[in-house]
Amino acid sequence: MPKPRATLKQSPADFRVAEQIDFPLTGHGEHLWCYVEKTSLNTAWLKREWARLTDCLPKDIAHSGLKDRHAITRQWLSLPAKYSAQLPDSGDGWQILERQQNERKLRVGAHRYNQFAITLRDIDADRAHIEAALTALTRDGFPNHFGDQRFGHTNRDKAQRWVERGQLPKKHDERAQVLSTLRADAYNAQLDARLAAATLHAPQPGDRAMLAGSNSHFTIEAVDDALLARLASGDIALGGWLPGKEKAPLPPAVTAWLEAADATQQVAVRYLEKYADGGWRALTVCPRDLQYHWPDAHTLHLAFTLPRGSYATALLASLFDLHDASSANSPSDIPSRPQNP
């Protein structure tokens, strides 16, 4: 059955996301943490603006996750506390909601969850059908694809050129972008292969299992009722390989995917095995606290929480044939760095 159509991001207010940390700040220290709300601004632009306003070095302004431009977003940024007086409380399109000092600088990936409030418009499907799909999604989760934001506008082409050279970029940011893009692309291809084979929820010995809400994982030795119950409850999910240096044997499903991959993908994986550290990512994820209501027959409002690194657009794409209204008005100079939610 075709997916129902829906329009996303008709305005920035239709897509709201807020980072959530799960640890207290010390209230003192050399670093100023700011919880900032911004509209129609991406993270890279705001960091450059703060550097301009304060004369702080750009490298000393830190973020946890990179957030999309076409949204209203709340996120944490930090900078040395000595620049606090030079940093205004607001600017064009942004406002600091909270300031706290902390002993440590903000690190990438410090937040644990993202809370979303999303409005979809122009829906052309029966309400009961969509509500049944939402119930199933809450129970079974959705395919945990890296979203298009991860790849920017030209990152795949740039990464492929470095693979063809067999070299790494010298600049740290560009190097991280190349490896991130290639790993995400390979992971998405594995996930698509398991979807096509209908094995996303069918574990086999040798598969890697991920503990929900963490990066901890283990190798499945045997498939029994206890393991299947943990999968069904969402306590664990099957894991997909983020290619890189890997000491343990790869699961049979990953080996089969790699053997069937085209030459370009195989060369990219060998490149990653030389230059990147291996990792694992859950193939499915269940949203927390999912709620919805219908303002009218063709408009759906969704609210839910996802772990850091999972994409709301992937959740939505599992349910709808999406038309992203913001893409029609995207200028070509939007930074193309990968977006880590």
Map each language-model feature to its residues.
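Non-catalytic, substrate/partner-engaging modules appended to enzymatic cores
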Residues: 1-341
